[in-house]
Amino acid sequence: MDAEVVGLDPARGRVETTRGPVNYDYLVVALGAELAPDAVPGLAETAHTFYTWEGSVRLRDALRTFPVTGGRIAVVVTAVPYKCPGAPHEAAMLIADYFRRRGWAGKVEVHLYTPEPQPMPVAGPVLGDAVMEMLRARDVVFHPLHRIAAVDGRARAIRFEGLPPARFDLLAAIPPHRSSRVVREAGLAGETGWVPVSPKTLTTQHERVYAIGDVTAIPLPGRWKPGVSLMLPKAGVFAHAQGEIVARRIAAQVTGVAALSEFGGDGYCMLEAGEAMAGFAFGDFFAEPGPRVELRRLGRAWHWGKVLFEQWWLAPPGPRREALRVALSLGARWLGIPMVT
């Protein structure tokens, strides 16, 4: 059915759509995260974003026409959580690489601001330090613990809470994220604003209702600091794995066999750094006493692995998709890394 979901009624087992109501026996909520640029005064009117297709095209064009005299480019994480923990760092490094390849090194400054204490904090201090070194090596200035308050488009300045403003000539922002209106109005969102689920089974508080992907809030058992809880990041690799687990569990319930499949919290990502180079981070996010995540050194293999993964993901079912899956699986086995295909 090609329709938009306009309401959820877990108590009655019904989904309201633009083409009428649909009753269900099992429901999988995979409505993702919405962008809310209007939550930051001045952001929507001033900032570019690469978190939408249209925004990415506009940002590309703005970079192509950036003044030859140079200037300052700011990449800003406006709030947490956000989709893909490595995306802001990749964006900053790729922007710096773009101008370096144009011979503009020294004319363009790239600054990355975030309210987080380090890059990818859920992965721990060792990985965070490694990513900061990657940023430094690519002339990206990293500004942690900068919580945005507003953007002054006329003055071309970012206002932060309790810190001096930062000037920019071009601003690329990761807007605040929130769950969809449908999820909130259905009472599925918890205190965090996202749908709380059982970490391993992805079940919600409602019978026969599951949630997967960016819409979920999944607490992690480990800690990096006493009393400071961690949440599973929002990333496609987790949504992919969770979807397969939920499908198996529902199939088991329908056929009357034991539902044994569980989500294990394993995840990975390729971290693009420019120059056709990337790092590879992977590990067990459910590990204790803290998530056990490893970052492999920069290499071309990780970059081309990401290109191959994208082609596999976008390919329609058929021989080409299967060939790409086999190539990915063999490459992952050769490199000694996990890969969800």
Regions found by a protein language model. Give the residues of each.
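A Rossmann-like FAD-binding core segment of flavoenzymes
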Residues: A3-V15, A96-V197, V257-A258
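FAD-site-proximal beta/loop scaffold in flavoenzymes
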Residues: L43-T69, A166-L170, I174-A241
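Flavin (FAD/FMN) cofactor-binding core of flavoprotein oxidoreductases
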Residues: R154, S261-A281
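Cofactor-binding loop segments of dinucleotide-utilizing enzymes, especially the Rossmann-like FAD-
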Residues: T78, P115-P117, D214
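Internal hydrophobic alpha-helix adjacent to the cofactor/substrate pocket in enzyme cavities
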Residues: D97, A235-G265
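C-terminal auxiliary extensions adjacent to catalytic cores
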Residues: G279-T341
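FAD-binding core/adjacent interface of flavoenzyme oxidoreductases
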Residues: M1-G103, A172
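Residues at the starts of beta-strands that form the adenosine-phosphate
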Residues: R72, K107-V110, R208
